[in-house]
């Protein structure tokens, strides 16, 4: 690893304390320096210090009303201390009614990914995050996999040529949409100046964990799956309103919470809703273009945000429910949840149960990371990633090691932690994946 690694010095100290030479080599072949085995412990120490500092800063903010203190937190699955501490810090600010950590949860910017918080008459700009309206869409075709199996490499190459992946990309085709004619929405959100750039970016996918997947279900029908959000529009909106609210950008920082009826709150909600509509339009555009490449007709579609704030009623109370990397799952509501790259995905549906109520009718949005992006690149090789995909018959275009399937939990294990809150309707097995190429950093991903 480069010497710029922020955890190297402490990892070397821990290695020496254990009586091990930090520069000795471990593992097969040349292996890696022994201190790398202590990097995770050094990182956890650092995050714990950050969480404690954030808690001290929060304690000096405007005191939380007594009726919102110690709100219940429902935790699905097992999480590291840093993730839980980050969530508790978030819940110590504002009119918090309850919170949830889903089983795929992990540290995020200000609020954990997989974290859900219900507010009374308030909304968290930090909680919604920078990729406003990031979500998934899946569409089932009347085309069977067996009918296209011989031309899958050609189809996925055409997808990569037709759809724009990566950062700062404009669409090769002009994407028309009625959203761009809604002048009131652009004015009320104070995002009018971004409208033309948003036109050029509609339907661009970005990088990181954003993708276009081709999958087949139990009956052999083809599904198109996409995952991305509102691109530069959402990032610009979030940055602008986070600054206006006096919020900070970082992992362990107090969340920026605003009143729904304040001028700032009203404008932010308008901007969030605009970005949400934009994200929906972009995913629909990509699915339709991919459908045209494959052929066939859509017989079913499932579409959901997982970075957003919804106005909902829970236990008779009207609340803002902020989901950051969590899928809404009300009884009978369908959701598309992807696994890791090349892993099975599911179409699921919420059920009514005490556990589901406690979850604020929320479930996972993916498998959830085991290792951060830098750690994944250090641990895994391209050969290992390619072998994993080849064994499962997945054709891949693009992607980097930070998205290695080995860096993620397995989706069935994660869903098992939410038993009794959702049921799986379809299991979708991918056969082709298109993502941005190596080295693309995406500030707009979730």
Write out the residue ranges for each language-model feature.
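Amphipathic alpha-helical segments in structured regions that serve as interaction surfaces
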Residues: 2-55
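Residue-level detector of alpha-helical segments with a strong bias toward transmembrane helices
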Residues: 21, 29, 113, 141-145, ...
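Amphipathic alpha-helical surface "interface" segments used
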Residues: 30-37, 177-183, 433-440
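Domain-length cofactor-binding catalytic modules of enzymes
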Residues: 56-85, 94-100, 109-113, 117, ...
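A generic, well-ordered mixed alpha/beta core segment in the N-terminal half of proteins
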Residues: 125-185
